[in-house]
Amino acid sequence: MTPVQCRMARAALDWGVLDLAREAGVSTQTIVRLERGEALKQPTLDRICEAFEAAGVEFIAENGGGLGVRIAKRS
């Protein structure tokens, strides 16, 4: 997950920094650091990704078409 994907995912879910921090169990400063492009420890990044994925976010790799996110269909 890139900083841009993090911001895109938050926007798609209508989450603020505080919402994401709460869902991931990290500080708001950690989210701010991620979105600034600062390196985070892998376990911390994993927790943030897992919070997004639990909310239905799918991360789209660049694959020549550009990075992105989408919200998975709920069955």
Can you annotate each of these PLM segments?
Residues 1-4:
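N-terminal acidic leader/helix
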Residues 6-19:
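Short basic helix-loop element that most often maps to the first helix and adjoining turn
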Residues 7, 32-33, 46:
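Key DNA-contacting residues within the recognition helix of helix-turn-helix
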Residues 16, 30-33, 51:
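Residue-level recognition of specific faces of alpha-helices
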Residues 19, 30, 44:
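Residues in the helix-turn-helix
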Residues 25, 42-60:
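DNA major-groove recognition helix of helix-turn-helix/homeodomain DNA-binding modules
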Residues 25-40:
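Recognition helix of helix-turn-helix/homeodomain-like DNA-binding domains
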Residues 57-75:
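Helix-turn-helix/homeodomain-like alpha-helical modules used for DNA recognition
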